[in-house]
């Protein structure tokens, strides 16, 4: 299976798994209950990265698995879709890779408007942008091949050891909440599980790359001359590029796209989406203009039309503060557990890592190797061991939000020397790396 080389703007050739047209079964009634069975070894709420991967790993070990989601597989993208190439290779998902990146580039944008030379960091291991829909469909197809069942329903809570949906109830020996930042199962048990004041908010457009001058590398813009506290980004992905803006919750009040607390409406996270579109337009019309094209031809040039006009945008809230990994009888994975790194807001790799482990533990429940209670305890220990790193990055995010442009520049330059950056990146990978888990038996 081939992988797109650095800077290659072509979608790589790869295995395209085909989903059956009857992926979702019609919910049926068995006596007073719905669904095909009364009890599964594992019931999962949510069919994005975390839920699909946990389902695949559990079913591979012989567990009976049900995945419940109201949306079609591969729809509802909220991610910028970049992770380590090694993670995609270990999952058998290199066919979804759109472009490989070996550099990270930081563009500092001070409020003064003075341009600084970009800081280029050579990555010690490659990252890749990938096709969200295809990855989800591939994972689902893998799951179907090992017996995973899917039901289309809206999950509303957890009660009396049963997952409650708008189409009935179903019981699992083990239950996973992988339904996103809202965590409907966990919050039905512990309403304070979700802290809205800890949520960042992002908005992104996927637009054509200028194919005659495609970009490479993962690009970030930071400073009081752009959205701050937060950042903007451009992630080239083959024929397209993803440009977005992110607002951290540490604003403390309305913040504009140019960093002013009075001249715009960036908003705290609870109202950030109102100003994010304006911030995204300013970014696409300014620093990000060279990275995209309206039609794949020349790069964008400023006009009277806002860049996002008529375009589909995606995004949402990002929980960059770790939550409890187990709530009552429910295991939380991915955004439901706050498994997004502070500062970078990367969540895909963490979702994959914790999903693999949760799926392996569920497989042990299905085989009788251990009890559901033991599985929850083992998952709690696994998550707790990694929690300090997530807490550290959340603290760094809050600390950086207090810095001026000089402080941001000094911090960025301090991390640039090769040995320092490589050490930081080795720790960054260790905290959430699915590769070792996929190389060892459960």
PLM features: residue spans?
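Extreme N-terminal leader/targeting segments of oxidoreductases
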Residues: 1-40
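C-terminal helical "tail/cap" subdomain of flavin- and related membrane-associated enzymes
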Residues: 21, 360-442
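Glycine-rich FAD pyrophosphate-binding loop
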Residues: 59-77
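Glycine-rich Rossmann-fold phosphate-binding loop(s) that bind the pyrophosphate
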Residues: 46-48
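N-terminal FAD cofactor-binding segment of flavoenzymes
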Residues: 71-105
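FAD/FMN-dependent oxidoreductases across multiple families
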Residues: 249-362, 366-370
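Predominantly flavin-linked oxidoreductase catalytic cores and closely associated redox partners
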Residues: 142-299
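N-terminal Rossmann-fold NAD(P) dinucleotide-binding loop
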Residues: 51
């Amino acid at each position: 299976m081939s992988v797109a080389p650095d800077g290659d703007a072509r979608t790589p050739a790869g295995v395209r798994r085909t989903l059956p047209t009857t992926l979702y079964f019609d919910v049926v009634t068995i006596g007073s209950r719905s669904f095909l069975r009364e009890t599964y070894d594992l019931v999962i709420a949510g069919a994005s990265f975390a839920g699909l991967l946990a389902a695949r790993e559990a079913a591979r070990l012989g567990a009976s698995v049900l995945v419940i989601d109201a949306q079609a597989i591969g729809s509802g993208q909220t991610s910028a879709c970049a992770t380590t190439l090694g993670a995609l290779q270990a999952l058998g998902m290199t066919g979804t890779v759109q472009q490989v990146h070996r550099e990270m580039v930081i563009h500092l944008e001070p409020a003064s408007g003075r341009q600084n030379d970009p800081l280029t960091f050579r990555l010690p291991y490659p990252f890749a942008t990938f096709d969200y829909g295809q990855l989800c469909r591939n994972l689902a197809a893998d799951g179907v091949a090992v017996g995973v069942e899917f039901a289309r329903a809206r999950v509303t809570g957890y009660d009396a050891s049963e997952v409650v949906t708008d189409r009935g109830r179903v019981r699992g020996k083990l239950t996973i909440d992988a339904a996103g930042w809202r965590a409907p199962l966990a919050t039905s048990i512990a309403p304070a599980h979700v802290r809205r004041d800890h949520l960042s908010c992002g908005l992104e457009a996927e637009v054509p790359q200028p194919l005659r001058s495609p970009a490479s590398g993962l690009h970030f813009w930071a400073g009081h001359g752009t959205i701050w506290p937060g950042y903007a980004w451009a992630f080239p992905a083959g024929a397209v590029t993803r440009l977005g803006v992110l607002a951290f919750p540490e604003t403390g009040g309305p913040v504009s796209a140019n960093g002013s607390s009075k001249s715009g409406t960036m908003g705290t996270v609870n109202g950030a989406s109102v100003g994010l579109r304006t911030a995204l337009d300013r970014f696409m019309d300014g620093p990000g203009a060279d990275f995209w094209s309206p039609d794949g031809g020349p790069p964008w040039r400023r006009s009277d039309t806002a860049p996002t006009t008529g375009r589909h945008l995606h995004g949402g809230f990002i929980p960059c503060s770790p939550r409890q990994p187990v709530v009552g009888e429910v295991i939380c994975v991915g955004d439901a557990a706050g498994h997004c790194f502070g500062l970078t807001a990367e969540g895909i790799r963490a979702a994959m890592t914790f999903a693999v482990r949760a799926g392996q533990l569920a497989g042990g429940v299905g085989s009788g190797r251990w009890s559901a209670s033991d599985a929850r305890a083992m998952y709690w220990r696994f998550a707790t061991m990694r929690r300090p790193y997530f807490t550290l990055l959340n603290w760094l995010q809050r600390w950086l939000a207090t810095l001026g442009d000089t402080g941001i520049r000094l911090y960025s330059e301090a991390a640039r020397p090769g040995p320092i950056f490589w050490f930081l990146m080795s720790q960054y990978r260790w905290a959430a790396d699915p590769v070792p888990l996929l190389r060892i038996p459960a």
